[in-house]
Amino acid sequence: PMSGPTKLPPRPKAASLFMAVPIVFLGTLGLAVAILFGVTRFGDQTASGDQVSITFGASCIDDARTQLIARAGQIGMPATMDGETMTATLPDMPDAANLIPKLLARQGRLSVIEPGGEPVFDNGHIDAVAIDLNEAGMPVTMLKLNAEARAMLKTLDADLELQPEIDGEAFPKIRVSSLQDTPELSFPSGEGKTSDRMKRAADRAIILEHGPLPCRVHITNVT
């Protein structure tokens, strides 16, 4: 007799809840924050933790300030900055005083590189950033390419394989023909618990939505 359809493993609770809104674009700030903090139980979606002052070191701090404040707001942590110091109330989540400043200071530089080593696409070719689910129900960071990138794709050899990178971290290669069909890049969130994967996916989405920072930024003090 014919066997029945293969049963998929139970979907993690966070992924099941996330399916209600499978693609969350970062433009919908409240929704993205609720998904990140509420669904994954990563923390509370409002800034209700400790008040903190984060001092950044950077030669470009005047140019980076707007992006740093935007990243903080995307996390659900409205912030103000005076010079190099940001004042904000942290989200109510474990190790926030360590994790949040590190996230804010990440470069957020996208590179999509052709086999000869030359970059084909960068942050300027991003149309929209989202958190999505892959076929296994796990969170991924998804980028839609803009009209300029789509026009460029038409001129490339369909069999070329491109290497996507975020801040030098390499992700699975993608064939040009796939991008010609669907001009989207998907960045897997790695291994571990669904909540950890969701945090990685959301972190990457935040730094790409508000990036890259115009120079290297580091943390000099957190109080």
Regions found by a protein language model. Give the residues of each.
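A structural signal for conserved, well-ordered secondary-structure elements
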Residues: 2-223
